[in-house]
């Protein structure tokens, strides 16, 4: 029935058109802190759309279920590429211009690599090269 449509849209990543990665228009130093990729049951209204709406050094970043002002983390060696290869992605994203949750491997915790996923770039466990 019609009651299933919002769930289907959420599953396809369409329900949050405002979900733009804060780093795209960022001019403040540092990077948004890494976040756990978990399924959100209820998205909160965005608290900001750009870094300049945030006080002091805070950046406008995606959090688990919202976009809000968070303290930046230092970009430790942005050119370092971690070992391993990104897993092969099958399928096509239904969302136009999906947000990237990382840009470089150094923004990912531990051994995780910044890889292309079905919808945007995310931190993933690499496969052996």
Curated annotation (Swiss-Prot):
CDD domains: WAP. Keywords: Antibiotic, Antimicrobial, Disulfide bond, Immunity, Innate immunity, Protease inhibitor, Repeat, Secreted, Serine protease inhibitor, Signal. Found in pregnant endometrium and myometrium, placenta, allantoic fluids, fetal cord blood, and fetal liver. Also found in uterus and lung. GO terms for molecular function: endopeptidase inhibitor activity; serine-type endopeptidase inhibitor activity. It comes from the Eukaryota. Pfam families: WAP. Acid-stable proteinase inhibitor with strong affinities for trypsin, chymotrypsin, elastase, and cathepsin G. Modulates the inflammatory and immune responses after bacterial infection, and after infection by the intracellular parasite L.major. Down-regulates responses to bacterial lipopolysaccharide (LPS). Plays a role in regulating the activation of NF-kappa-B and inflammatory responses. Has antimicrobial activity against mycobacteria, but not against salmonella. Contributes to normal resistance against infection by M.tuberculosis. Required for normal resistance to infection by L.major. This is Antileukoproteinase.
């Amino acid at each position: 029935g019609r009651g299933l449509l919002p769930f289907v849209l959420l599953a396809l990543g369409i329900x949050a058109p405002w979900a733009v990665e804060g780093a795209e228009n960022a001019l403040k130093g540092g990077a948004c802190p890494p976040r756990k990729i978990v399924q959100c049951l209820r998205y909160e209204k965005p608290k900001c759309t750009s870094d300049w709406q945030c006080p002091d050094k805070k950046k406008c970043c995606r959090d688990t279920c919202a976009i809000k002002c968070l303290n930046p983390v230092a970009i430790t060696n942005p050119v370092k590429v971690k070992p391993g290869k990104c897993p092969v992605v099958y399928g096509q994203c239904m969302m136009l211009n999906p947000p990237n949750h990382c840009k470089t491997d150094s923004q990912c915790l531990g051994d995780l690599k910044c890889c292309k996923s079905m919808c945007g770039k995310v931190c993933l466990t690499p496969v052996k090269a």
